[in-house]
Structures are given as C-alpha cells and as structure tokens.
Curated annotation (Swiss-Prot):
Name the record gives this protein: Large ribosomal subunit protein uL1
GO aspect biological process, one term: regulation of translation
Family per similarity comment: Belongs to the universal ribosomal protein uL1 family.
Swiss-Prot/TrEMBL keywords: Repressor, Ribonucleoprotein, Ribosomal protein, RNA-binding, rRNA-binding, Translation regulation, tRNA-binding
Underlying gene: rplA
Keyword Amino-acid biosynthesis: no
InterPro entries listed in its UniProt record: Ribosom_uL1_bac-type, Ribosomal_uL1, Ribosomal_uL1-like, Ribosomal_uL1/biogenesis, Ribosomal_uL1_3-a/b-sand, Ribosomal_uL1_CS
Length: 230
C-alpha cells in the first residue's frame, strides 16, 4: 500500500518498534496527525482472547468521561410513555412500526438504534439489514431496554460500544486531536479499567498483549500497558 508524504514523515517522529509510556504516546499521536481535519484519536487493545469461545467474545458499552467529540444520531423504537421519554431525552428519531418500515427500505440516517423489548420481535426480522452494519440493538450494549430515557442520555453523553474482532482486538475512538491530552488519557484509562473488569476467568497468561494509539490515517504508536494502570 502506497503511503503519502505526511504519513511517511510522521514515521520519522517516533520509533515504530518501541513501546512508549501512556502520556508520551498520547502526545506523539497528536503530533503525528496526518489528516487536515480535526482527526479522531483511536486506540486498539490486542487481547489474549479467542473470539470463537463464547465466554471470551467480549462485547459491551461504557460512557467515556469526556465523550468522543462526535454527536451521534439516535433512533428509538418505542411506544407510549417510553416514546415520550425518548423525545424528552432528545432522541433524533422516535417511532415504532413506522420506523421499522423505513429501515426495511434501507433508511439508515442514524448511528445508534435503541429499542424496547416490546419492539424486538418486529425488529428481529431486519437482522440481516442491521446486523452487518452493527446497528442491531443488543441488551449487552444497553440498546435493548425499557429505560430509554437513560439509554439516550448516555449515548448523547459519550457512550461507546466495544466488541472483540476476529483477530482478538478491541478498537475504540477516544476523542479528537483537539482534545486536551488529559482528556484523552482519562478516556483511555476508563476503557482499560472496563476491559480489566470484564476479563474472562478462562484467560491464561498475559491478558493485554499490546495497545496502540493513532489518529485517523496516521501510523499506530505502541503503548506500554503497564503505564496505563499507573
């Protein structure tokens, strides 16, 4: 894959083979920005997990203390009082069968879909449409719930979902390059603590194999996992 001049120049700013203390790695990530826009700061945790094992296939959600810098569009499938709560929480779209019908016609003008348990039987028919896009509501991520007021508020306040991929990685957006380093650090530590809290008991050996941080289109910088817990 051919790399641009800015990408190649950013590689000269750090040692790709070295692991850096958390604070220094965050600083380097901001310095090595390649994109001309306010790029996202992303991290990847490579975990000693087998996604084929049910108890090790991690999936969940958490609220980052400083959000991600991105305002997400939220659609809510609910009726009656719960629909009113969704509107109160400033969900972008609220409906029931009317929204399901729109989605069935390939309407996806939202980032997160929240549904009450009552709506799931009708929505489950659209699994083939929503599943591949990562939009199917799931109890593990808090998007299937009767408390739609709280669900929408959390999403609007910086809640992110995480899921182990086929290679054993958890990818997450920590914020924007414009964020203070302290905010990025606290967001990353929050994710780290969450991953430690849900560590499967069946894990043998080192749980966190490696951690990298980067900005959009920029090279990854390795973080010393030990410095995250300090």
């Amino acid at each position: 894959m051919k790399r641009g001049k800015k990408y190649l120049a950013s590689l000269q700013m750090f040692d790709v083979k070295k692991t850096y203390p958390l604070q220094e790695a965050i600083s380097l990530a901001k310095q090595t920005q390649v994109a001309k826009f306010d790029a996202a700061v992303e991290c990847a945790f490579h975990l000693n997990l087998d996604p084929k094992k049910v108890d090790q296939n991690l999936r969940g959600a958490l609220v980052l203390p400083h959000g991600t810098g991105k305002v997400l569009k939220v659609a809510v499938l609910a009726k009656g009082e719960q629909a009113k709560q969704a509107q109160e929480a400033q969900a972008d779209y609220v409906g029931d069968q009317d929204l399901i019908d729109k989605i069935a016609k390939n309407w996806f003008d939202f980032d997160v879909l929240v549904a009450t348990p009552e709506m799931m039987p009708q929505l489950s028919k659209l699994g083939r449409l929503l599943g591949p896009k990562g939009l199917m509501p799931n109890p593990k991520t808090g998007t299937v719930t009767n408390d739609v007021l709280q669900a929408v508020k959390e999403i609007k306040n910086g809640k992110i979902e995480y899921r182990l991929d086929k290679s054993g990685n958890i990818h997450a957006i920590l914020g924007k390059v414009s964020f203070d380093e302290t905010k990025l650090l606290e967001n990353l530590k929050t994710l780290y603590l969450q991953l430690m809290a849900v560590k499967p008991r069946t894990v043998k050996g080192t749980y966190i194999k490696s951690v990298t941080i980067s900005t959009t289109m920029a090279p990854g910088i390795k973080i010393d996992p030990v410095t995250i817990s300090q």
